[in-house]
Amino acid sequence: MGGPHAKAYMGWWGSIGSPAQKGITTYTVSPYAQKPLNNIFHNAVFNTFRRVKSQILYMALPAALYWAWWVNCRDYNAYLYTKAGREELERVNV
């Protein structure tokens, strides 16, 4: 354990003169990691379209239901405050 012992020192790390290394794995950097901004604008357009397309029903259906409810309530309220709806307003406004 620890540092080199007497007559066992073979030089600094990577120095010529050391015995051949076994089991050394070398790694390289992926070309995609070397160019992180490659095609950024092209991918932004098509990726945004793909993501919006996959989520549109989760936004459009509740929005359509809310809009239909809002229009119905607005029209019903306008009807209640007309001469024709006065009787129903009295009945609803208990």
From Swiss-Prot:
Q: One GO cellular component from the entry?
A: mitochondrial inner membrane
Q: What is its main location?
A: mitochondrion
Q: Which residues cross the membrane?
A: 50-80
Tell me which InterPro entries the record gives: Cyt_bc1_su8, Cyt_bc1_su8_sf
Ranges in the topological domain labelled Mitochondrial intermembrane: 81-94
Q: Name one GO biological process term.
A: mitochondrial electron transport, ubiquinol to cytochrome c
The role this protein plays is:
Component of the ubiquinol-cytochrome c oxidoreductase, a multisubunit transmembrane complex that is part of the mitochondrial electron transport chain which drives oxidative phosphorylation.
The family classification in the record reads: Belongs to the UQCRQ/QCR8 family.
- Identification of the protein by name: Cytochrome b-c1 complex subunit 8
